[in-house]
Amino acid sequence: MEVLMAERANLVFHNKAIDGTAMKRLISRLIDHFGMAYTSHILDQVKTLGFQQATATSISLGIDDLLTIPSKGWLVQDAEQQSLILEKHHHYGNVHAVEKLRQSIEIWYATSEYLRQEMNPNFRMTDPFNPVHIMSFSGARGNASQVHQLVGMRGLMSDPQGQMIDLPIQSNLREGLSLTEYIISCYGARKGVVDTAVRTSDAGYLTRRLVEVVQHIVVRRTDCGTARGISVSPRNGMMPERFFIQTLIGRVLADDIYMGPRCIATRNQDIGIGLVNRFITFRAQPISIRTPFTCRSTSWICRLCYGRSPTHGDLVELGEAVGIIAGQSIGEPGTQLTLRTFHTGGVFTGGTAEHVRAPSNGKIKFNEDLVHPTRTRHGHPAFLCSIDLYVTIESEDILHNVNIPPKSLLLVQNDQYVESEQVIAEIRAGISTLNFKEKVRKHIYSDSDGEMHWSTDVYHAPEFTYGNVHLLPKTSHLWILLGGPCRSSLVYLSIHKDQDQMNAHFLSGKRRYTSNLSVTNDQARQKLFSSDFSVKKEDRIPDYSDLNRIICAGQYNLVYSPILHENSDLLSKRRRNKFIIPLHSIQELENELMPCSGISIEIPVNGIFRRNSILAYFDDPRYRRKSSGIIKYGTVETHSVIKKEDLLEYRGVKEFSPKYQMKVDLFFFIPEEVHILPGSSSIMVRNNSIVGVDTQITLNLRSRVGGLVRVERKKKQIELKIFSGDIHFPGETDKISRHTGVLIPPGTGKRNSKESKKVKNWIYVQRITPSKKRFFVLVRPVVTYEITDGINLATLFPPDPLQERDNVQLRIVNYILYGNGKPIRGISDTSIQLVRTCLVLNWNQDKKSSSCEEARASFVEIRTNGLIRHFLRINLVKSPISYIGKRNDPSGSGLLSDNGSDCTNINPFSSIYSYSKAKIQQSLNQPQGTIHTLLNRNKECQSLIILSAANCSRMGPFKDVKYHSVIKESIKKDPLIPIRNSLGPLGTSLPIENFYSSYHLITHNQILVTNYLQLDNLKQTFQVIKFHYYLMDENGKIFNPDPCRNIILNPFNLNWYFLHHNYCEETSKIISLGQFICENVCIAKNGPPLKSGQVILVQVDSIVIRSAKPYLATPGATVHGHYGETLYEGDTLVTFIYEKSRSGDITQGLPKVEQVLEVRSIDSISMNLEKRIEGWNKCITRILGIPWGFLIGAELTIAQSRISLVNKIQQVYRSQGVQIHNRHIEIIVRQITSKVLVSEDGMSNVFSPGELIGLLRAERMGRALEEAICYRVVLLGITRASLNTQSFISEASFQETARVLAKAALRGRIDWLKGLKENVVLGGVIPVGTGFKGLVHPSKQHNNIPLETKKKNLFEGEMRDILFHHRKLFDSCLSKNFHDIPEQSFIGFNDS
């Protein structure tokens, strides 16, 4: 103390708060100066002082002390603004998901960090004695980040997988969390808790394995005499200065170090602070130091190779168990660090990049040839400079030059005006951080249903040639064209065919899919329409008036349009030459036995129609009977239309039936029950007897109706009929008795002896004379059918337009399928169709085209962009195209096909549509969609996509378009005309009409569908629409039909919206069909912004776009699925592979350490260390020839892999701020890398191939045999290394006990009990510390040591004895740098 008092005069007085780090420094200085005991004494006094002060001044903490940082509000607002812009970019498809995630995390992380930095100055200014503030920097409990969560914002959390949740917690704990934030923070907290539990066991196991590997390593010698070392150079910029100092302090030099001619340090001298500082200042040559790697022995280590003991700053003592210390020092931080869970989610590439900012305002100039455009990791455009780039900034009076280093990103364009402090470039983080990057896969899922398209070529990954994994060669968009698919496992669905229309409430099997996609503006309309248009369905006879008709169109093409019924399940079947479009009526849905009716379009087998042949027929379910009976036409004559028998395939029953054409409206059906029985069957009723309902007739038959039984025996079978009705025994006077088989109309009096009454319905009187008895009259009920024109195909196929359109006529004819009086037999339960409504094709005999006798018909499948559609096409064979010139439209002149050729030669498919009122009402009430099947290659139906109509908007209107005056008024009221939000193409809802250019009116009163405000104009019919449609095939050729025969080719419902623009103005962009347009791209000059989508229709003055969602993908991303494939919500679209920094926290770090130590593959891309090693082995052996090659190859490989392993492990720990001395890691790595694998049988047969032996042993054996042993280096994981030691007892006590012991017994292994564990197991003295001397006998040592060393050792021993009592003297003489025992200096003296 006196000395201190004396020196106090010239000491500097530090008036400064001492925090944790300052305290650490102070203590280390004290230890350096005064040694351990003295220091502990001083610290004791400091502790006492501290407690006295703390007792005097207590701190209380109240909730008012938690002051929120004032700048938080606008910081958070700013961050939200940025995320909003980012979200928009992502929505437009400018940024892909990974970039969005990265950027949003960086935005929030920066905000959170900024708040954290604000916290301290804020407290210092407003309330320096705030207890929270004092606490957070005391270094005791609580650190800045915890306080930051109390008063700043909690920031980002990670989910259970360790991925970031990109929704930050904006509140702090003082303000309180919202529900969402609370749940997210529970994720983070739970992850912390779970990780702590899980990782503790992991870390414990890691420690156990590490100790297992190195437990036998003890310091047994002072010097192994190696000449090798590892060179460390301070000049090399790779290693920061502090790491450099850490590496050197406590090591022993392997070589003298010269500064010019002067030697500033000698070999075997240990390095202290002073020496290190000298090295740094002099920037001397690379310094060669001794490490455990260079130690000559395998099973122990010498003092000089180990260096100073970290505990007391002296050279390590003999007999110290350095192996166990090393294992623990690596394993222990693992258990501690599990508690540090960092919430950065590993997105940063080793810290945020550095920025270069502009020194002043001005214009920026640089040489554009030296940079090339690229994307930053946030998806922003930038320029990458490959060499140094000089940027000049010209402000008003001065030029600034800024130098931008290579590999940086320039964020501004040439000649751009920049403001002072604006970020102009981003310097890529140093190369050193690249090592702990990790490749991570990120899947992007589709958030809507639809079809997939992509706008660029893709490569098939070679291993998935036939799969659906594609690689993107360049940055491009993937598009999901919206539409709702419907999944069903029912086979039933295969009868839905492409382009069928259906209600959104359609029944599929027993399951009901309901979609209310377009309910938005419908409610209003439902009210308006429900009063006028209620269709009464009390009679339960379905009203077919709202069916679409079959259309005949340009060049005699008949394109069928599917039929939609309000509650119909619509199925269309395509057979080889026949379409059936069935309908279900309500009646049938309840009573499912009835087969469904349908319109069948049928083509003759040879494909040729003669005149008057039947094109399509419709079996009306009302003319269908289940029971057998007789048809009567009364007195009306009929004639058979088709003379030859016509083969009908109907419901699988082939029957020859002539067709009889009806002349009248009435026909009668007399029901009877008929059973046809085999001749051998026993009948339980007599002929002419009367039975009741459900009487037993034969063993397994019961009667369905009651009545008179007639039995007729034919050749091989019995026909049994039951006639229902009344039986009269007429008197003589009754006239009726003379008739038999007569139909009596209602109203005729019927007299009889007892009573007389009027007949209400038609009846059929039949006279029956049984044998031996008087005859009687059977009065049978009759079912009357009348055929009205109201409910037949006339509504389906109005003849006007057909006739007007080029001479083709479709006549509608009703046929009765059975002759007059013919008995009709129903087979089991099938129904019998009595009347068939047919559509007869005919054409006028024109003078010019009189030669035209036959028409060819075929079903056409058109495939556009992978979708298949069916059309029925009828061509008159010799018809010239005569009408093209007549009806040309001026608007058509600009719309030729792309190559400029005239479009008249392209065969168009035109269509005309007409609607009835029920159709309108129903299309307004009900959301509908169209079935749109996607076929796979074998044309089996795979899935349906139901495209339904939603979010339609029509943009415009523009100037110079002539409108009706009515429409003009409505435009004034409402510039955006809502066309009905569930717009679809025709057939599903109202036509989309260019109201001022209608070419073809069928209707009497024109109505305006486009504006539902003008309801008074709604009459029962309305205008037919024409569209300019273009067809695109796979090669992108455009079939552009003549505008005067405008065609609808996509009768399916999409998400559409309209964009009107006037082609009179020049358009800024030329729109091609099928083109994809991103949102916010302006097409016309003053046009509104678009939604994103694909152009599916280009009109003279507007385009229709099908909504689509773009997803951006970068090169190397994997696309799942095929082009045009249906995707469902939540399906994987793309997989990105991106890099994120490894070890965001120790939870990610520990597994990395383990991976390195177990020598597993670390990242998916870079080669494993093992492979690298093999490469080295081969090359060097080839260069140097065999005997030396193996040795040197092995040595070099081992050296290289060792250093890289040490660096990798250090990186993980350093990223956590954990300092572990390199030598601990080196000891363990040395054990992993010191084995070689014998690769082939030498002549000597000393080792068997595949045996693992130590490298030194292999060298010695090679020297002894004077023959090359072939071996190669292997990297063992720590588990394998602990199972390949010299002691089988230690191996057996670790793992696989039975196997290890059995093998050892077979080989006759000997355990020399050199390690700790073997001795512990067997209860011997541990050869460490005090038990160490007993192991090494001097005699044993002398046997295997060469002569000179013996002499040297003797000399050492003598000197030690002489100098022992002078030790203290020496100690004080030596400079502060060397805390050495004299022995060492003498050794140094001897060696030099």
From Swiss-Prot:
* Record SUPFAM superfamilies: beta and beta-prime subunits of DNA dependent RNA-polymerase
What's the catalysed reaction? RNA(n) + a ribonucleoside 5'-triphosphate = RNA(n+1) + diphosphate
GO BP of this protein: DNA-templated transcription
**How the cofactor binds, per note?**
Binds 1 Zn(2+) ion per subunit.
Q: Mind telling me which GO cellular component terms the entry cites?
A: chloroplast; DNA-directed RNA polymerase complex; mitochondrion
Superkingdom, taxonomy of origin: Eukaryota
Note the SS bond partners. Answer: none
The similarity annotation says:
Belongs to the RNA polymerase beta' chain family. RpoC2 subfamily.
Query: Function, please?
Result: DNA-dependent RNA polymerase catalyzes the transcription of DNA into RNA using the four ribonucleoside triphosphates as substrates.
Question: Which protein are we looking at?
Answer: DNA-directed RNA polymerase subunit beta''
Which species is this UniProt entry from?
Nicotiana tomentosiformis
Q: What is the lineage of its organism?
A: Eukaryota, Viridiplantae, Streptophyta, Embryophyta, Tracheophyta
